[in-house]
Regions:
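N-terminal Sec-pathway targeting helices
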Residues: 1-19
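Catalytic glycan-binding domains that act on GlcNAc-containing polysaccharides
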Residues: 41-213
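Hydrophobic membrane-insertion alpha-helices, especially the h-region
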Residues: 14-31
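A general, composition-driven signal for non-globular sequence regions
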Residues: 5-8, 30, 84, 102
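Signal peptide processing junction and immediate N-terminal pro/mature segment
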Residues: 29-46
Length: 213
């Protein structure tokens, strides 16, 4: 504080004012009493831990894609195993896959379907899977959890299922439904809210029974 008295600015100050200013500067610079007022330390908050993926859920071979599928299923209340089965048939997990008909991405979304379910970029794996999963949930709800009819709707459109009151007599659609339903191993998928679905499909597990990412 003797050093401060030698500065012109501080020599002009009255003793009480000088004492207050000196004390404030001393406290700020050393962190005593108030901490460093002008340069507070920002403590970085740790990122929340990712929920582990159950070991019995299929893998795409990519931890990033597996996480996208699991998270989309958890959010929408759709079994990730079902989503995996659909993606395996649609694109074999090739995220930039394109069909001659104009379908794009992991879940082979057509432009109208992407727009309908809020996907602005069909080439973005997360957006593609999110929209495709929303469509699957919509179809499951429309057809009361019937997996085969939902798959037929995904492939040929729900209008075709309504028209034929069942799986349309198209060779491609019938083969599509058979392959995916057998791969998934179920013919019924309950339509549930996400919290209930997580319990139904055993999505919340501890790290000892989860896959390693």
């Amino acid at each position: 504080m003797k050093l401060l008295r030698k500065l012109p600015l501080f020599r002009a100050l009255k003793v009480p004012t000088f004492a207050v200013v000196s004390f404030f500067l001393f406290a700020n610079l050393t962190g005593v009493f108030f901490g460093r007022v002008f340069a507070p330390e920002v403590v970085a908050q740790p990122a929340p831990a990712l929920r582990p993926i159950p070991a019995d859920i299929p893998t795409s071979g990519s931890a990033d894609i597996d996480r996208v599928i699991f998270d989309a299923g958890e959010r929408e209340g759709v079994d990730p195993r079902f989503i995996h089965a659909v993606i395996w048939q649609e694109s074999k997990y090739v995220k930039d896959a394109k069909s001659r008909a104009g379908a794009v991405g992991l879940m082979q979304l057509m432009p109208a379907t992407a727009e309908r379910f809020g996907c602005e970029d069909r080439n973005d794996p997360a957006a593609n899977v999110e929209a495709g999963t929303k469509y699957l949930k919509w179809l499951l709800k429309r057809f009361s959890g019937n997996v085969e009819l939902a798959l037929a709707g995904y492939n040929a459109g729900e209008g075709s299922v309504d028209k034929y009151n069942g799986i349309p007599p198209y060779n491609e659609t019938q083969k599509y439904v058979k392959i995916i339903s057998e791969r998934y191993g179920k013919t019924y998928h309950p339509v549930l809210e996400p919290v209930e679905a997580a319990e139904e499909f055993n999505l919340h597990v501890d790290s000892t029974t989860a896959t390693t990412e």
